[in-house]
Each structure stands twice: as C-alpha cells, then as structure tokens.
Regions:
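A polyanion-binding, active-site-adjacent surface
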Residues: 2-202
C-alpha cells in the first residue's frame, strides 16, 4: 500500500509540474507577467482558486493573513489562479491591473481542469467572479456568495476574493468590509470542517 501511495504521489507531482511548465511557457496571451500556477501542497485536499494573479503585495499579504487565521492546515492547501497572468493596461503614463478578458479566461481554463484532475481535491474554494465564471459562465458573483456548487464533480464553496475586498473599500463602510472579511474566513473554516467530517484531517 505504501508503494502504491508513493507512486500516486509521484504521478501527481509530475502532472502538476507539467501544468506549471505549460503556464510558465504559455504564449497564448501577450501578457508580460505570469505567476506559477500553484503554491502549496501537491497532496492538497483543498484547492483554492483565486481571481487572476496579482502582484499587489497588500492583497497578497491580507490573503495570507486570512489563511493563517483560518482552521485550514497549510499542508492541505493548494492555491491556484483562475487566470495565471497579471493582466494590465496602460493608463496615461502608468500601468494598472485590469480584469482578464474572456479570451484570457478561456486560455487558462484548460490549466485549471488539468490541475483539478491531477490533484483530485476533496473540496474547492472559489474566490471572486473570475474563478466562478470559469466554471459557471455568465454568472453573477453576488447570487452565489456563500453557496455550495460543484466544479468538475467536486463540492465547491463560493465567496468574494481578497482582491474584491480591496476594490470594495472605496464604497463600503468599515463594518461592511469587516463582514466580508469574516465571510471569507468563514468559508475557509467551512472547508476545514468539511475535511474533519470526511475524516481526512488525520
């Protein structure tokens, strides 16, 4: 049995690394900046699909802080992006980040499917509209917040992304922002509870 488990682990690692290499060498889009497709454990039981990749350090730090505050075990998490590129546009003399186009989303969908097939997580956490629309095209994120859906046959929890949270700061009250932060944290904890109920945290 141990030999079989080692074989499965090695095969999973090879598959995930293969997808990662495809993303790093992808030329489907003209985007200059790309991130690795994953961060975390290849033996993950929880796959977290974030919005498109970002290089905003404040967003990255706040997201990591929420993960650290949650009941999730870092050894159980694999984190990927719905779109692996940092999508940008020029605004006068500066370059700012933008939402990915439908074409860019479509180009990355194959990589998401391959990661899910390779890792076979017990549960998925989908954060943000971009992640949701990769699996339920044309959907309105607000209608799916705090719901459970099924992506590629796997139970999936839906919520805002941390990037959404930062964008909402300009027209939401502090109390509303705190409520959304708590909601995202609750989603992480719900995934941890799901694993406990499934007996997969041993």
């Amino acid at each position: 049995m141990n030999l079989l488990n080692e074989f499965r682990k090695q095969n999973r690692q090879e598959l995930v690394l293969s997808v990662n290499n495809k993303i790093l060498n992808c030329t489907k889009c003209d985007n200059e900046f790309c991130h690795k497709c994953y961060r975390g454990s290849i033996n993950a039981k929880v796959l977290i699909i974030n919005d498109n990749a970002t290089n905003d350090e404040d967003i990255i730090k706040y997201y990591n802080d929420l993960i650290d505050m949650s009941e999730l075990n870092n050894n159980d998490i694999l984190q990927v992006f719905a779109v692996s590129c940092v999508t940008t546009r020029k605004d006068k003399d500066s370059v700012i980040q933008r939402l990915p186009s439908k074409k860019e989303c479509g180009n990355c969908k194959q990589y998401l499917n391959e990661i899910i097939d390779a890792v076979k997580p017990k549960i998925i956490i989908s954060l943000g509209a971009t992640a949701l629309n990769q699996f339920i095209p044309g959907s309105n994120l607000l209608e799916y917040i705090n719901t459970k859906q099924v992506f590629n046959g796997i139970p999936t929890l839906i919520n805002y992304s941390v990037k959404d949270l930062f964008n909402l700061c300009s027209y939401k009250t502090d109390d509303e922002i705190d409520e959304i932060s708590s909601s995202i944290l609750a989603t992480f904890n719900e995934a941890a509870q799901y694993l406990r109920l499934e007996g997969d945290n041993s």
